[in-house]
Regions:
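Charge-rich, low-complexity N-terminal segments
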Residues: 1-39, 93
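Ordered, soluble secondary-structure elements with a strong preference for glycine-centered loop motifs
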Residues: 2, 68-69, 108-115
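Hydrophobic residues embedded in beta-strands of well-ordered beta-sheets
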Residues: 26-27, 47-49, 97-98
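Long, continuous compositionally biased terminal/linker segments
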Residues: 33-61
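Short, internal acidic amphipathic alpha-helical interface segments
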Residues: 52-99
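A generic structural motif
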Residues: 57-61, 104-113
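Ampiphathic alpha-helical segments that act as solvent-exposed interaction surfaces
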Residues: 73-85, 110-135
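Short, highly charged C-terminal tails/helix-capping segments
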Residues: 133-146
């Protein structure tokens, strides 16, 4: 039996999170990690459960970049990183900001799968936040915004 939207807050609390409801299908948690504060949004959208670190970078840490404006070559580097990732991927949100996300089909979804996706999100954020930020700033020094 699949997890329904009403069960998601309990799963997150079981991971020692304090989810705050945005609406009846969306929750946000703010976590302190080894690379600073991480904001995770979890949305149950019927057939899919979306887990996202939004924004991926700490506010103010990437200066003039974001909102769809990135130096030439940076997004290609981000796609190259995606090839090495399992269960999570970098993407751009509707505002053009970099996010890290995981998408799980809700059919037969188990709490352990949510826990694994959360683990991968946090592990990837800790591994890649600084190197990806450095790559963005390095590309920015070499090229104007695209």
């Amino acid at each position: 039996m699949a997890l329904d939207a009403k069960e998601i807050p309990g799963v997150l609390r079981g991971l020692k999170w304090e989810p705050r409801a945005i609406d009846d299908r969306t929750w946000r948690s703010t976590l302190q990690t080894g690379v600073g504060v991480v904001r995770v949004v979890v949305r149950h959208a019927g057939a899919w459960l979306y887990l996202s670190i939004i924004p991926f970078f700490e506010p103010g840490s990437i200066d003039r970049w974001g909102a769809g404006t990135y130096p030439i070559g940076f997004l290609g580097r981000l796609l190259a990183v995606n090839r090495n990732l399992n269960m999570v991927k970098f993407a751009l949100d509707d505002d053009g900001d970099v996010v890290l996300k995981s998408e799980l089909p809700t059919e037969n979804l188990q709490a352990s799968e949510v826990a694994e996706a959360v683990s991968q999100l946090l592990k990837t954020a800790e591994q890649y936040r600084q190197p990806v930020r450095d790559a963005l700033l390095e590309a920015g020094r070499a090229a104007p915004p695209s």
